[in-house]
């Protein structure tokens, strides 16, 4: 009996052809292609980097997002029934292979590429940049610089949104996985900066403001700027709307008993101004 995670070469090749056709529609190969590698901790909002890249390339860029290939596994529905929230673990080998195959196919033709990642390690960006430069690509790295409290809340909000859409496949990002990237990203970015593999390393906030460019300040490492933004204190005014949105979604999903819900409520209570003490009524003489 075949393993439910298995798929045939024909199934894979057929889907690969469809993906390549879809991704390259209205896109043109160029003489001097550029590959943009994206980084940032989970929940930081890496999709917002696409706006800056689209503007830079006049929209002529192919976005390769590993997550979008997971549901393409030929047996995805059966795997969901069997593994539910753990399904991602069983379809990731498929999505990884699809990502690699698409990059290989498009790099040979010279399309501008956006390749999503996190920056949790330095190995993958170095290998990817080296491989693409062998095909005469210019390689750049654009990274989200977002306070860690904002990105962690982003992972919770994303999960609650996914849960409302499909409880069986909604998968939370463990806080530990988020925090590992937060801890490693500044040092990893400094290492990547020193390799000289990237013609430009940029840091952007969620508003699309460029906070750093190695092209503009080549002697300065991105590490300090990123650490400062990751650890920046966030005002109550800045964080309150996010907390309220998450609380509302968690109530709708009936997640009031979760530790995350209790933590959200505690944080919201801490942002409320203290209640002024009730003044004591002065005693009148003889009473």
Swiss-Prot record:
Its EC number is 2.7.1.176. Keywords: ATP-binding, Kinase, Nucleotide-binding, Plasmid, Toxin-antitoxin system, Transferase. Residues 273-287 have a biased composition (Pro residues). SUPFAM superfamilies: P-loop containing nucleoside triphosphate hydrolases. It catalyses: UDP-N-acetyl-alpha-D-glucosamine + ATP = UDP-N-acetyl-alpha-D-glucosamine 3'-phosphate + ADP + H(+). InterPro entries: P-loop_NTPase, Zeta_toxin_domain. It holds the Pfam family Zeta_toxin. GO terms for molecular function: ATP binding; kinase activity. Residues 250-287 are annotated as: Disordered. The keyword Kinase applies. ATP binds at residues 40-47. Belongs to the zeta toxin family. Toxic component of a type II toxin-antitoxin (TA) system. Phosphorylates UDP-N-acetyl-D-glucosamine (UNAG) on the 3'-hydroxyl group of the N-acetyl-D-glucosamine moiety, yielding UNAG-3P. UNAG-3P inhibits MurA, the first committed step in cell wall synthesis, which is then blocked. Phosphorylation is inhibited by epsilon antitoxin. Part of a postsegregational killing (PSK) system involved in the killing of plasmid-free cells. The zeta toxin induces programmed cell death. In the presence of the epsilon antitoxin, forms an inactive PezA(2)PezT(2) heterotetramer. This is Toxin zeta. It comes from Enterococcus faecalis.
């Amino acid at each position: 009996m075949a393993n439910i995670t298995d798929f045939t070469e024909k199934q894979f090749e057929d889907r690969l052809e469809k993906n390549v056709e879809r991704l390259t529609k209205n896109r043109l190969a160029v003489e001097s292609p550029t590959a943009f590698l994206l980084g940032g901790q989970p929940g930081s909002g890496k999709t917002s980097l696409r706006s800056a890249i689209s503007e830079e390339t006049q929209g002529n860029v192919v976005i390769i997002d590993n997550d979008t290939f997971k549901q393409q596994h030929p047996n995805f529905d059966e795997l969901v029934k069997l593994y539910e929230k753990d399904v991602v673990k069983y379809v990731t080998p498929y999505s990884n292979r699809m990502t690699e195959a698409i990059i290989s196919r498009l790099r040979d033709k010279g399309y501008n590429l956006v390749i999503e990642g996190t920056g949790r390690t330095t190995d993958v960006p170095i290998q990817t940049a080296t491989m693409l430069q062998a095909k005469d690509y210019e390689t750049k790295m654009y990274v989200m610089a977002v306070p860690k409290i904002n990105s962690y809340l982003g992972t919770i909000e994303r999960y609650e949104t996914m849960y409302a859409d499909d409880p069986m496949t909604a998968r939370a990002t463990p806080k530990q996985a988020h925090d590992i990237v937060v801890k490693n990203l500044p040092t990893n970015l400094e290492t990547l900066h020193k390799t000289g593999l990237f013609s430009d390393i940029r840091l952007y906030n969620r508003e699309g403001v460029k906070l750093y460019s190695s092209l503009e300040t080549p002697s300065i490492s991105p590490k300090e700027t990123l650490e400062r933004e990751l650890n920046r204190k966030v005002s109550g005014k800045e964080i309150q709307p996010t907390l309220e949105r998450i609380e509302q979604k968690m109530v709708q999903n009936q997640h009031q008993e979760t530790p995350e819900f209790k933590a959200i409520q505690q944080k919201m209570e801490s942002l409320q101004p203290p209640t002024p003490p009730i003044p004591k009524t002065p005693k009148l003489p003889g009473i």
